[in-house]
Regions:
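A short beta-loop-alpha structural element at the N-terminal edge
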Residues: 3-17, 28
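Hydrophobic adenine-recognition pocket in adenosine-nucleotide-binding enzymes
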Residues: 7, 124-126
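Long, low-complexity intrinsically disordered regions in eukaryotic nuclear regulators
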Residues: 13, 34-37
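Helix-loop element at the rim of GNAT/NAT acetyltransferase active sites that forms part
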Residues: 17-34, 43-52
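A short helix-loop-beta-strand connector motif used in the catalytic cores of GNAT acetyltransferases and
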Residues: 41-61, 71
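Conserved beta-strand in the GNAT
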Residues: 60-62, 68-77, 120
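Conserved acyl-donor/pantetheine-binding loop and adjacent beta-alpha core of acyl/acetyltransferases
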Residues: 77-123
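Conserved acetyl-CoA-binding loop-helix of GNAT-fold acetyltransferases
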Residues: 104-108, 126, 131-147
């Protein structure tokens, strides 16, 4: 049976095993036991809040398949509340020379800052052996259902 649920501190060993055996596929979660534990505690604290307005909360979800944790996803709220988020925006710029009859489109990356707090879908990882059959979709969409509740 498949089940998506919020993470618990007691999941530490299983979540740690999932992350540390993910190879290069898991770039959004810490690798050390101490840092993973902090993330789980942060999520549990967020779960216990009676929230009217999000304020730097984290919600980690696990996908269980027959009792084994095989996937992880997350929601982060109020990103950029205390310091701006930095991101790159891709655009296209056109160079043109009429005298040379030359036109060239160039991809340009420009640096942007976001100072408005926003919520972010983060971390989505599923063990390769469990991909397909809608499991990744379930793990991802569970976040939207949680946000709409």
């Amino acid at each position: 049976m498949k089940c998506v649920r919020l993470v618990k501190s007691s999941d530490l060993k299983n979540v740690e095993h999932l992350i540390n055996n993910s190879g290069a596929g898991m770039t959004t979660m810490p690798k050390t036991s101490q840092e993973i534990k902090k993330r789980l505690i942060w999520s549990e604290k967020s779960q216990k809040k009676n929230i009217k307005k999000p304020s730097q909360d984290s919600y980690l979800f696990v996908l269980e398949d027959n009792g084994r944790i095989v996937g992880l996803s997350a929601i982060y709220t109020s990103v950029s509340l205390k310091k701006p988020s930095v991101f790159f925006k891709k655009s296209t710029s056109q160079l043109e020379s009429k005298s040379l009859n030359f036109t060239k489109d160039l991809d340009v990356l420009s640096l942007h800052l976001c100072k408005q707090p926003y919520s972010e879908l983060g971390t989505l990882f599923l063990k390769p052996a469990f991909r397909g059959k809608g499991r990744g979709t379930l793990l991802s969409f569970a976040r939207f259902i949680f946000m709409s509740a």
